[in-house]
């Protein structure tokens, strides 16, 4: 069940205390993820966008790697049982809004729910309503126009904003591979490069055989 972490006995206690007070305690890692198998299977299958699928796998991996469910609350570390998603949605007038959706392990159920949330955001009143008080999410953004190699996010909540932020870019082709630019930004008081490495390894592992998960 959701609970607060006992930081007094946490192996990272001193690291946590050190980075918690930084003005900018975030670090960002950019890489390229091989989505060749995912794209090929979805072309054969039809009916599901690649974007919807990579949101699912990025969120599933985040739920499996426990520190991605840590959040800072009043200087304490809160641990969510499950974290959900929110993503940017481009509007017809070229402004953007946000869509929020729940994580569900079943692929088809997730795609249905997230797809409805995104469509409702796209066809709604276009109002920009960020849920600043909802930290039980991963913040996603999609830039399908840019194969980026570096990325940083705008932030305005001081050093207590501990929600991981993930960006997806424009596919790039290299030899026979289809590569997805991928950025993950996290709070250093809550995790280190080792944690992000485990997250990326798990994500890559799932994307080698995505059909196992649907």
Where are these regions (language model features)?
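Aromatic-residue-lined binding/catalytic grooves and analogous aromatic/hydrophobic interfacial grooves
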Residues: 2-5, 29-37, 44-48, 61
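Acyl/amide activation-and-transfer machinery of modular secondary-metabolite enzymes
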Residues: 20-41, 82-105, 179-185
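Hydrophobic "lid/gating" helix adjacent to the active-site nucleophile
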Residues: 48-85
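Generic non-transmembrane alpha-helical segments
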Residues: 57, 61-65, 117, 202, ...
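Helical lid/core segments from catalytic subdomains that handle acyl or acyl-like groups
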Residues: 91-148
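Active-site-proximal acidic secondary-structure segment that organizes catalysis
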Residues: 108, 120, 160-214
């Amino acid at each position: 069940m959701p609970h607060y972490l006992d930081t007094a006995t946490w192996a990272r206690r001193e690291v946590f205390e050190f980075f918690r007070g930084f003005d900018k305690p975030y670090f960002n890692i950019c890489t390229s993820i091989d989505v060749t198998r995912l794209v090929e299977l979805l072309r054969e299958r039809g009916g599901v966008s690649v974007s919807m699928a990579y949101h699912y796998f990025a969120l599933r991996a985040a739920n499996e790697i426990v520190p991605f469910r840590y959040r800072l609350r009043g200087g304490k570390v809160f641990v969510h049982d499950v974290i959900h998603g929110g993503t940017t949605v481009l509007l017809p007038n070229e402004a953007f809004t946000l869509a929020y959706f729940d994580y569900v392990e079943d692929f088809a159920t997730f795609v249905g729910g997230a797809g409805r949330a995104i469509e409702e955001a796209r066809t709604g009143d276009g109002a920009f309503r960020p849920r600043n008080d909802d930290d039980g999410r991963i913040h996603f953004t999609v830039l399908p126009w840019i194969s980026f190699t570096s990325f940083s996010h705008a932030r305005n909540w001081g050093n207590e904003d501990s929600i991981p932020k993930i960006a997806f870019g424009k596919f790039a082709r290299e030899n026979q591979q289809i590569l997805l630019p991928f950025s993950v930004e996290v709070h250093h008081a809550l995790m280190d490069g080792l944690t992000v490495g485990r997250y990326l390894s798990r994500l890559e592992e799932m994307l080698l055989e995505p059909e196992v998960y649907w």
